[in-house]
Each structure stands twice: as structure tokens, then as C-alpha cells.
Amino acid sequence: KDDIERMVKEAESYKEEDDKQRDRIAAKNSLEGYAFQMKATLDEEAIKSKVSEEDRKKILDKVDEVLKWLDANALAEKDEFEHQRKELESVCNPIITKLYQQAGGAGAGGMPGGFPGGFPGTDGSGGGAAGGDGGKSGPTIEEVD
């Protein structure tokens, strides 16, 4: 019985540390995923023709900088990963938002297929798109059983 109580206390004492580690890893994965998502978005043919070479280079340079930082700082704290993501979003979001608005919103106006996988930055992991509600001015489509 004493062993069980001791193990429960040990588990409780490690819980906070485990939670911090989980949050740190989630922030790292979020940053890495966003960086690769931006890179993939810019490689799509439908997007390539709509982004200026200057804007494309600006995003890709920042993505490469972030990926190099990730390689060198794999054990960084959650706040550092979140800061890097915000910096990356501050470069990407204005360009992608402008592109999205030029396309006429959610897949309309010459943007075949829209943004595959959804609009970058709206994966629910924070940040979101700079520029307000994005393409929410159009009709709402609800799934019916």
C-alpha cells in the first residue's frame, strides 16, 4: 500500500513537468508544420503564378531561416517556438491574405480548388490569418445527414 501511495505522489509530481514538455513539443510541431505548409503552398502551380517573385522569396527566406533555427534549437522552450511562429506569420500572413483576397475568397474567382488543406494559418493552433475574417463573407454551407 505504501508503494502505491508513493507511486501516485511521484506521478503527480511529474505531471506538471510532463504537461510542460507536451506543450513545448506541440509548439515546436506547430511551428514546423506551419513552415512546411507555407513552403508547400508556394510550390503549388495555382499559387506560383499569383505570388510575385519578391513576395515568394520573402516567405521562402523566412521559412528557411525558421527551419534552420529549429534544427539548431530543437530543445528550445515553448515561448521561443511561439515567438518564431509569430515572426513567420508576420511575414507570411499579409502576403497570403492579399493573395487570398485577390482570389475572391474561398476558392472562387480563378483559384481552382482554393487552398488545399484550408487557408494557411487557420489550423486552430493559434495565430490565425491577419486581415480579419478571411473569406467568411460568402454563403455558409452546412453538412446535412
From Swiss-Prot:
Region feature (Disordered): 1-21, 103-145
Compositionally biased spans, kind Gly residues: 104-137
Molecular function, one GO term: ATP binding
Pfam families linked: HSP70 (PF00012)
GO CC annotations, alphabetized: endoplasmic reticulum chaperone complex
Alphabetically ordered keywords of this record: Allergen, ATP-binding, Nucleotide-binding
Matches recorded under InterPro entries: HSP70_C_sf, Hsp_70_fam
This protein's record includes keyword RNA-binding: no
This protein's record includes keyword Nucleotide-binding: yes
Biological processes annotated in GO: endoplasmic reticulum unfolded protein response
Sections of the chain in a coiled coil: none
PANTHER family per the UniProt record, alphabetical: CHAPERONE PROTEIN DNAK (PTHR45639:SF34), HSC70CB, ISOFORM G-RELATED (PTHR45639)
Family, similarity comment: Belongs to the heat shock protein 70 family.
Protein name from the UniProt record: Allergen MAG29
Organism: Dermatophagoides farinae (American house dust mite)
